Amino acid sequence: MPTETLQTGSMVKPVSPAGTFTSAVPLRILNKGPDYFRRQAEPNPKRLSAVERLEADKAKYVKSQEVINAKQEPVKPAVLAKPPVCPAAKRALGSPTLKVFGNHAKTESGVQRENLKLEILKNIINSSEGSSSGSGHKHSSRNWPPHRSEATDLHRHSFAESLKVYPTQGRSSPQEGGSHVGRRLLEQSAESFLHVSHSSSDIRKVTSVKPLKAIPCSSSAPPLPPKPKIAAIASMKSPEADPVEPACGVSRRPSLQRSKSDLSDRYFRVDADVERFFNYCGLDPEELENLGMENFARANSDIISLNFRSASMISSDCEQSQDSNSDLRNDDSANDRVPYGISAIERNARIIKWLYSIKQARESQKVSHV
């Protein structure tokens, strides 16, 4: 047997279980004591707050004895005040029957609410069906009287006024008088229908009302040209329609009409003002007097020359293509036709040139006076 194996065997020492425990567990845990392990075994150990920890170490950083003796309590969250309970609720809570059957009462109240909603829906459906069947049944199905205010009445009255169709022509034939009677009967029925309460059936009926169509007038009445005076139209109403007209405080306002002569006069004035502005270049009368009207007339003749053809060839080509047949038939009418005017670009260029010449004339006059 070799000596090396004997030496190694003698060097190996048996390891005791106490030695393994001491080597595995640190020394600082062994020095803690049994209280440390008991605290870890507790399910929810109470943790000190910051105030309590400072209170314990107060002697280290506080010098005065009064502060050391004074104890600071931790701040607690504010407790919310409960709402006051009415005495009826207290009695209900105190009664043993409600405590025992509380859940059953809750379910009963929920069922009652659902039944109430179903009854309301049934009443609405019955009222809508009754309104479609007849007005008598509709009034019997209501459980509350209709309440109308002045604002709603005024709104309905204005809506009924908007449904009315006013006559557009001055004269009216006997057939038109009959049509006016029919219109007013429809208006009266619409007004009587509108004076109802705000229920769901009424709203459905309002939405389903068709707009009243104007009854076409007879073709025997000849068309008349529009007249400038409105009073003449009001005086020529048919005498048959006046007694049937319903009494209402709102006065009718006929639409404003203008005669063709008035419109043409307005257009002519606008054209004249524009032409005068371009002819006189927007100069004041004082400047025109200083320049002299004879000089202005000579320069103005350059601007207002109507014999000069327009620079816009598109409009001239269109006019020539439209009037080509008439030119071939009548040469005299072509000579009498008014020639083309000057385009806006050409006119502006001539105005600028003319103003420049006026400026040069003024400067030359100043030099001559000096």
UniProtKB/Swiss-Prot annotation:
Query: What do the Gene Ontology cellular component annotations say?
Result: centrosome; cytoplasm
Which parts of this chain are annotated as the region Disordered?
A: 127-151, 237-256, 317-337
Q: Which domain of life is it from?
A: Eukaryota
Keyword Nucleotide-binding in record = no
Keyword Coiled coil among UniProt keywords? no
InterPro entries listed in its UniProt record: FAM110, FAM110_C, FAM110_N
Q: Which Pfam families match?
A: FAM110_C, FAM110_N
**UniProt feature, compositional bias: Basic and acidic residues:** 326-335
Where in the sequence is Phosphoserine found? S238, S301
Where is the protein found, in the record's own terms? Answer: Cytoplasm; Cytoplasm, Cytoskeleton, Microtubule organizing center, Centrosome
Swiss-Prot/TrEMBL keywords: Cytoplasm, Cytoskeleton, Phosphoprotein
Assign the protein's first listed, main location to one coarse class.
cytoplasm
| UniProt record similarity statement | Belongs to the FAM110 family.
The molecule here is called Protein FAM110B
